[in-house]
Amino acid sequence: MKNFINIRDISAKNLRKIIFDAKLRKNKRKKLNALDVDKDNPLRGKLLVQMFEKSSTRTRLSFYLAIRQLGGGALNLRADELHFAKGESLPDTAKILSTYGNAFMLRTDSDHKLEEFKKHMTIPIINGLSPSSHPTQVLSDVFTIEEIKKKPISKLQICWIGDPNNNVINSLIEASVKFSFKLIIGCPKKYYPNKNLLIWVKKNKGKIKIFNDCKKAARLSDVIFTDKVVSMNDKTNKFKKLKDFKNFQVTSKIMNCAKKNAIFLHCLPRGSEVTNDVFFGSQSRVFQQALNRIYVQKSILLYCFEKLR
């Protein structure tokens, strides 16, 4: 049994195995419908219990399809539907979920809660998003980049424009170390990545640079990422933050600073951090990016069940 909580906790070798398996499985589904089961049916009869404390579109749908295509089934729960929301202890809830299900995916508003579920569960647990991390999204993004660019991400320059301290960029920073790629962050002054994460990056010889000018950050990059400036976990002054980031919108001028064949990625949902012409433009790959979550999450599930080929 293995868990999938943070990218930094998983070896580069196992992360690469997940991506390799996802590529094989995607190639074998070209003539199959969304609910058709993979021929090897590796998780036949397995139940994935999903609990959502926060709203979800792509994570909910992609994990549902992932477990179905592997031969299993999914049960979606909201915390407020359970006795857990009305006083039943977390350890008791974890034991019950472990009794009924074979794996547990949690989308939560608390990193502490995620760790407590991990401590008390006897089945694999997957982080479907927490305040500090979104590992399933970012591993899927690495897959998408390599699929489009047809080369290892270690040979590419990745640029992030926007908030340098949210769950997606945290996982992207961790991935930059595990996959050895150059990561450039463009953000306003007085905004910085998580300090403890930067210490970990330095200790592991990561390749990260920070610019307070988004044109300089985007220069000669192969991929431009962004995300909502005000995320689901933000407790800061919304209007002040939007004002601080007004010059860090991804526009066609920013894309023109990157390489001619650069692509644009966004985990969604979007706000004002990207213009429509970029989002719907020829360099945007956001819908391919969203689709690929199914395939990578299938391989994450197999990793957790120790059934990776």
Give the positions of each predicted feature:
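Short, structured coil segments at secondary-structure junctions
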Residues: 70, 100, 120-122, 179, ...
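Rossmann-like adenosine-cofactor binding region
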Residues: 202-278, 283-284
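C-terminal helix-to-coil terminal segments
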Residues: 280-309
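Active-site cofactor/substrate anionic-group-binding motifs, chiefly glycine-
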Residues: 47-100
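Anion-binding alpha/beta catalytic cores of soluble intermediary-metabolism enzymes, centered on
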Residues: 30-32, 95, 102-175, 266
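Positively charged, low-complexity intrinsically disordered leader regions
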Residues: 1-61, 65
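Glycine-rich phosphate/diphosphate-binding loop of Rossmann-like nucleotide-binding domains
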Residues: 53-65, 147-226
